[in-house]
């Protein structure tokens, strides 16, 4: 039992107050098959004293049936929750685990290492601040390592810890560690990952995971847990660009009209000049109302309600920004695309696009190229299949305000929705806006009448009014 659990049992109020003050780090583990991702998470939980006795007894029993570690307790069984995963000894789903230490709270996403589960990894990585990339000390930097690193870079994760695992099988050789470190740094020069750190570990035995290992006297860095506790992520937040997607109009009575939502980046204070998009109408912040009443300032990631001096038309899906700091605004964008559905992405097919709180119909008009996630080569493509990634152009039925994903992960991301099944079939990241050409398609009388007929008698098809395209 760690000190936190002891405090929890003795003084629940003191525990809650202490817990409330900690910041949170979201991170994912990724690596090739059998690199030890689930074992590492189990080791972090075990050595941090975050496993209860009944859990330990259960996995000790299960280790004899499903374990892969001989006489040792298979800590990977703490995370591999699905029966099919245990039987195959692999991770399929994205498994989330929550734990905390005296310094920080953590959410771990254990993501699949297989290429056919790329969409699962993208889902797990989309909300993370840091990635732990496991490398098998016996194999070094492999194709899968490059693929995972590319995906981490694509999704805007700025901090990477390369955990060189199974060092016990290489007799904790410093030469092996340095060679892998050198190979990875050479490869990573073509990626946008500003902070890369390395740790030699043995997840099975716990070397350099939570406790410093006596087997690596040549390693002067911190253990994996200490690195996770001390890494600074506060500077990653976008505090310059105020973006406030409106979730709903809050009107409890005739005397109050506010706009509720989450500050996804930046900050706002009373008296600031704002612009509502897409209308472009301007006003001034009258008040900011939070859970405990009025406040002078609101900043990311607070959920709040903003009232304005002027009665301007704002509804769900609109975005409130500072008048002197406007985002991109266009109905056409160049984007990175990740396809997540078994039915391929087909250009010019109508989909739904969801940017923050705004839903707008549109289509992918062009696939410029597909990106080979293993080699990062660009290939010609006329469609994207399940788990494939590409660069393309989207055309929306109305203008949408957003930022490049590299500048703002919250307003630069979107999901693609199948309008018949309402399932999420893809995800995207904005690269840049494409200026509208101003040309308008001419439709025949028959096309106009047919479009009107479909929208009138088959509203569940969600057909777009082509006169507004």
Curated annotation (Swiss-Prot):
Map out region (G2) in residue numbers: 89-93
One Pfam family from the record: GTP-eEF1A_C
Pathway where this protein functions: Sulfur metabolism; hydrogen sulfide biosynthesis; sulfite from sulfate: step 1/3
Q: Which reaction does it catalyse?
A: sulfate + ATP + H(+) = adenosine 5'-phosphosulfate + diphosphate
| Keywords for the protein's UniProt record, in alphabetical order | ATP-binding, GTP-binding, Nucleotide-binding, Nucleotidyltransferase, Transferase
User: EC number(s) of the enzyme?
Assistant: 2.7.7.4
Q: Which family does it belong to?
A: Belongs to the TRAFAC class translation factor GTPase superfamily. Classic translation factor GTPase family. CysN/NodQ subfamily.
Q: Subunit structure, briefly?
A: Heterodimer composed of CysD, the smaller subunit, and CysN.
* Name of the featured protein: Sulfate adenylyltransferase subunit 1
What species does this protein belong to? Answer: Pseudoalteromonas atlantica (strain T6c / ATCC BAA-1087)
Gene from which this protein is expressed: cysN
């Amino acid at each position: 039992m760690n000190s936190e659990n002891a405090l929890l049992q003795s003084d629940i109020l003191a525990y809650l107050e202490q817990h409330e003050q900690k910041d949170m780090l979201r991170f994912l583990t990724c690596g090739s098959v059998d690199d030890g991702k689930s074992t590492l998470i189990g080791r972090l939980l075990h050595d941090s004293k975050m496993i209860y006795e009944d859990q330990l007894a259960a996995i000790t029993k299960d280790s004899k049936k499903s374990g892969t570690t001989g006489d040792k307790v298979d800590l990977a069984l703490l995370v591999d929750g699905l029966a099919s995963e245990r039987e195959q000894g692999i991770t399929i789903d994205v498994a989330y685990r929550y734990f905390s230490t005296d310094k920080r709270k953590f959410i771990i996403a254990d993501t699949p290492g297989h290429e056919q589960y790329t969409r699962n990894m993208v889902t797990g990585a989309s909300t993370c601040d840091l990635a732990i990339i496991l490398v098998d000390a016996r194999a070094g930097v492999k194709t899968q390592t490059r693929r995972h690193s590319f995906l981490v870079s694509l999704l805007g994760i700025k901090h990477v810890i390369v955990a060189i695992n199974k060092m016990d099988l290489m007799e904790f050789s410093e030469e092996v560690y340095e060679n892998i470190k050198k190979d990875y740094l050479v490869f990573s020069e073509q990626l946008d990952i500003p902070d890369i750190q390395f740790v030699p570990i043995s997840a099975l035995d716990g070397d350099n995971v939570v406790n410093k290992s006596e087997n690596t006297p040549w390693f002067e860095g911190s253990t994996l847990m200490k690195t996770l506790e001390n890494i600074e992520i506060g500077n990653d937040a976008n505090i310059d660009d105020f973006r406030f997607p409106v979730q709903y109009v809050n009107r409890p009575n005739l005397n109050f009209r506010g706009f509720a939502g989450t500050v996804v980046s930046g900050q706002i204070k009373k008296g600031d000049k704002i612009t509502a998009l897409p209308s472009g109408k301007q006003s001034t912040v009258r008040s900011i109302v939070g859970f405990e009443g009025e406040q002078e300032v609101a900043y990311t990631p607070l959920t709040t309600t903003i009232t304005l001096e002027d009665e301007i038309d704002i509804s769900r899906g609109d975005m409130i920004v500072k008048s002197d700091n406007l985002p991109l605004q266009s109905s056409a964008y160049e984007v990175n695309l990740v396809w997540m559905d078994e039915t391929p992405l087909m250009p010019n097919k109508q989909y739904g696009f969801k940017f923050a709180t705004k839903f707008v119909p549109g289509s992918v008009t062009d696939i410029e190229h597909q990106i080979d996630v293993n080699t990062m080569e660009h290939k010609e493509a006329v469609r994207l299949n399940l788990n494939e990634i590409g660069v393309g152009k989207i055309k929306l039925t109305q203008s949408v305000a957003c930022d490049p994903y590299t500048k703002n992960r919250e307003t630069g991301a979107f999901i693609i929705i199948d309008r018949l099944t309402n399932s999420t079939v893809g995800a995207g990241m904005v690269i840049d806006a494409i200026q509208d050409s101003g040309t308008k398609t001419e439709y025949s009388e028959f096309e106009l009448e047919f479009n009107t007929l479909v929208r009138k008698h088959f509203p569940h098809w969600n057909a777009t009014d082509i006169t507004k395209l």
